[in-house]
Swiss-Prot record:
Upper taxonomic lineage: Archaea, Methanobacteriati, Methanobacteriota, Methanomada group, Methanobacteria
Reaction(s) catalysed (UniProt annotation): guanosine(15) in tRNA + 7-cyano-7-deazaguanine = 7-cyano-7-carbaguanosine(15) in tRNA + guanine
Gene Ontology MF annotations: pentosyltransferase activity; RNA binding; zinc ion binding
Gene name tied to this protein: tgtA
Organism: Methanobrevibacter smithii (strain ATCC 35061 / DSM 861 / OCM 144 / PS)
InterPro entries: ArchSynthase1/Queuine_TRR (IPR050076), DUF5591 (IPR040777), PUA (IPR002478), PUA-like_sf (IPR015947), PUA_sf (IPR036974), TGT-like_sf (IPR036511), TGT_C2 (IPR029402), TGT_C2_sf (IPR038250)
Protein name: tRNA-guanine(15) transglycosylase
Annotated residues for binding of substrate: 119, 190
A GO cellular component entry from the record: cytoplasm
Annotated pathway: tRNA modification; archaeosine-tRNA biosynthesis
């Protein structure tokens, strides 16, 4: 029903399959009023819409027509349709005269594609007692709806809505309980008041505590989120669908949506974008029009800008630049920036879903970039890597640092008691933003060279660097810090090492590839992969390492774009022999064994388990339940997703081990 096609952070480009067609996500569902609709939303990019089943049910004429001709003909939309159950009316008026079972039955009758149970929308900041009471009713109705749908063999997909007000633990509880029901989609409800009051920080807590406890294999719908300025942040948190009545409600009030906020027509001197409406009309033109015509044109603009933003977000996911877009969008309003900073508190969760390598470089746009998955991941790996006795800290230079390191390095100040140099027992690292300390032996692997940051460090960068140094100097007997670093950070060291002139970085390709293997596959992988008569072949054009052999037997290729090691059959055998189960492994069932041996790609439904540290784009070993090596390939999903999905590819197999 749902497959992931591309990933970045928790954002994903996916395909939602329904009885009325497929929908690419992230996507927006314009709200269609069954009586008042004046705009053909499909013309402006709508692949899926949402309408209110309760409003149709309450209108005898509409109810009769919908039962006779079906919902699609009633609202003149042949694509997928989601229906709400009347929960919004329940939240506004306090009651609706329809039961949960009746509204499920009616949605099936009118042939909606995705129906919704009658949940209780609990407003933000209510008492805990009310939130808990409402939640129990929501859970009871969700279970009733799923059971009834299944018992009646209904065709429609079913939403189960996550409630819990602004209590993170109640959101988690609700998500956990709904997951057990195995619904088809999971809306996150009662968030409109948070967005209307610019409580975006609280929105982050609500969404993250919901999404983290929902199945990765099902789409999530952020209910009522219709303003394009919030889309990028919401997608980065794992939301796949949005619905919007804002496009028409704002137009009724002469307000134009944009990714920077909302413009009032009365204040506009220039049109805010390059859509068809903005190119063909001036603010004065719109102000001079009859109300209805003006409303429809502004609504068209609002749809245009909303769908344009979603196209941009999907493209950012494809190229791996989603977080750069999020950081840009969240500077449109101080409360959004606060929300972005709050999202940094969830970096450990986000890291599980972020691919190891991306098509785009990492751009540092501010202190918030320091909390991104790539930075956290590097720090974790650096802490786990083996260390030598001494550490030399160098200032940043042109990238890759190891290629341009000078033969004469300059003066070095000593942290701790001075000892005689032992360059064979010394780690050389560059100090730079945003990754802190970068060992020269691994500096070409993504994203340690594939990043850009301002040469002028901001206060947050300086604090980050100082904390980094404070931690890592304690791991070494002697730390030698370059004079330029001392000056830049105003470090109070005054003793220049007596052998400063003798400090040299000796490039060693074998040590380099071993260090990269340890960084990529885990400590010990380098020695296991590169034992024997190792020969390293470089590109004549670029000088980069391309192939590594034991004699004439290929072990790995090094990918030029990110310096990741790509296993050959021999490399896979060596890594498998040297690592403990389930490290670097994806375990498939017996049905998949013969196909894996032949080099066929692995589908998620055949996976029994996998290493929990696997991330999308990782090179992995494919084994059976007895740990026999069957094949090797590239993970398309992270471990959490591989274990949860029952559809779609999990591993793109490079080669099977069949003789």
């Amino acid at each position: 029903m749902f497959e992931i096609k591309a990933k970045d952070n928790r954002g994903r480009v996916g395909v939602l399959k329904t009885n009325s067609g497929d929908v690419k996500t992230p996507n927006l569902m314009p709200v269609i009023h069954p009586r008042k609709q004046t705009i053909d939303v499909k013309k402006y990019g709508a692949d899926i819409v949402i309408t209110n089943a309760y409003l149709i049910y309450k209108d005898e004429d509409l109810k009769k027509k919908a039962a006779e001709i079906g919902l699609h003909k009633l609202i003149n939309f042949d694509g997928p349709i989601m229906t709400d159950s009347g929960s919004f009316q329940l939240s506004v008026y306090g009651d609706v005269d329809i039961t949960n079972k009746e509204v499920i039955e009616f949605q099936e009758l009118i042939k909606t594609d995705i129906g919704t149970s009658l949940d209780i929308p609990t407003a933000p900041f209510v008492t805990r007692e009310k939130a808990e009471a409402d939640l129990e009713v929501t859970l009871e109705r969700a279970k009733e709806a799923v059971d009834y749908r299944n018992s009646q063999n209904m065709e429609m997909k079913l939403n189960s809505v996550v409630q819990g007000s602004t209590f993170p633990d109640l959101r988690r509880k609700c998500a956990d309980e709904l997951t057990k029901l195995d619904a088809d989609l999971y809306p996150i409800g009662a968030v409109v008041p948070l967005m209307e009051s610019y409580h975006y920080k609280e929105l982050v807590d609500v969404v993250m505590n919901s999404v983290a406890h929902l199945p990765d294999s099902k789409p999530r719908h952020l209910m009522g989120a219709g303003h394009p300025m919030i889309f990028a942040l919401a997608v980065a948190m794992g939301c796949d669908l949005f619905d919007s009545a804002a496009y028409i409600l704002y137009a009724e009030d002469d307000r134009l949506l944009s990714v920077r906020g909302t413009y009032k027509l009365e204040n506009l001197q220039e049109m805010p974008c390059s859509c068809e409406v903005c190119c063909n009309y001036t603010p004065d033109d719109l102000r001079a029009m009859p109300k209805e015509k003006r409303r429809d044109l502004i609504a068209q603009h609002n749809l245009n800008v909303s769908f344009a933003e979603l196209r941009l977000i999907r493209q950012a996911i494809y190229e791996g630049s989603l977080m750069e877009l999020v950081e840009e969008r969240c500077r449109a309003h101080p409360n959004l920036l606060e929300a972005l900073r709050q999202l940094g508190n969830y970096s450990k969760d986000l890291e599980k879903y972020d691919p190891r390598s991306k098509k785009s470089a990492f751009f540092y746009t501010g202190s918030e970039s320091l909390y991104r998955s790539e930075v956290l991941r590097h720090i974790q790996k650096l802490r786990a890597m083996p260390r030598k006795r001494d550490l030399v800290i160098l200032p940043p230079s042109r990238k890759p640092y190891s290629k341009y390191v000078s033969s004469k390095l300059g003066n070095f100040y000593v942290y701790g008691s001075e000892q005689e140099l032992d360059l064979n027992n010394t780690d050389f690292m560059v100090l730079d933003i945003p990754f802190g300390l970068i060992p020269l032996e691994i500096d070409e692997i993504y994203p340690l060279s594939q990043n850009e940051s301002p040469r002028t460090w901001d206060v947050s960068s300086l604090e980050f660097i100082e904390d980094f140094i404070s931690e890592f100097v304690e791991y070494y007997d002697q730390v030698l810090i370059h004079s330029n670093v001392i000056k830049k950070l105003d470090i109070g060291l005054y003793n220049i090492h007596s052998q400063s002139d003798e400090i040299r970085y000796a490039k060693d390709d074998l040590k380099k590839v071993k260090a990269i293997a340890d960084y990529q596959f885990g400590v010990g992988a380098g020695d296991a992969l590169f034992a024997g008569n190792i020969k390293i072949e470089k590109s004549k054009k670029t000088g980069k390492i391309r192939h590594i052999y034991d004699g004439k037997t290929l072990i790995v290729n090094m990918r030029a774009s990110d310096s990741f090691l790509i296993l050959s059959k021999e490399g896979a055998k060596r890594l498998h022999a040297a690592t403990q189960y389930p490290k670097n492994r994806v375990v498939v069932n017996k049905d998949s064994e013969p196909f894996s041996l032949e080099g066929k790609s692995v589908f998620a439904k055949f996976v029994v388990e996998c290493d929990e540290d696997i991330r999308a784009k990782d090179e992995v070993l494919i084994v059976n339940e007895e740990d026999k090596l069957l094949a090797y390939g590239k993970a398309l999903l992270g471990a959490c997703e591989i274990n949860d999905f029952q559809t779609g590819q999990a591993i793109k197999t490079r080669k099977g081990m069949k003789k």
